[in-house]
Amino acid sequence: VLPEIHDRFQELRLFVREGVPAELNQDLRGAKHDLILSTQPIAEAGLEISPLFREPLKLVLPLDHRLANKEVINRTDLVGEEVLTIDEHHLYHRQVTELCQTLGATTRRDFEGTSLDTLRQMVVMGMGITFLPSLYVASEIRDSDPLRVTDVFGVNMYRDHALAWRSRSPARPLFRRLAQTIRELVPATGASDLRLLY
């Protein structure tokens, strides 16, 4: 959505930085950042938070995995499975760990990725299975990749995204317009399973 945001908000100078959500939140409160886009939860005291969308998580398996050819994967199929995740400093690690507890699976502690790209490559190499966000899947995984991407039947797996800014920021009206614009642009991202939040 960034090119379209740049076209619509030419007066806005965006500097994109990636970081751990807790650090982004702290930097926002400390006025190092004016605005953050992050997954929920975001600590709310002193911040205005505008929910954007709900993003499903997809189960990703190597093609030689025992479940790769199963038409429908159920939660019981994942009992005892070892799941790859990123290192524990990321909120995503906690989300995947909680999901694994719900499914009766475990997270692998001997191999942890440093990014979603690393997780994808680890699955391609047959090191295990993982869960990846649908936006990442839509933008980075190709039909030619030796992976099976699927849902887990009967399990609601997702993460919520929001924009946040300091509640006293003089740019509040601009940030609210920006949040609405992102909601308008999300359907064109290619991830058809996102749900808008308001």
PLM feature spans:
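Structural detector for helix-capping/boundary residues
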Residues: G19-A22, A31, E55, T76, ...
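Well-formed, non-transmembrane alpha-helical positions, independent of function
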Residues: E4, Q26-D27, P51, D77, ...
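C-terminal effector-binding regulatory domain of bacterial HTH transcription factors
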Residues: D7-F9, S134-D145, G154-Y198
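Beta-alpha-beta core module
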Residues: A45-P56, K70-E71, D77, D117-R168
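Central regulatory/effector-binding core of bacterial HTH transcription factors
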Residues: V1-A45, T106, G113
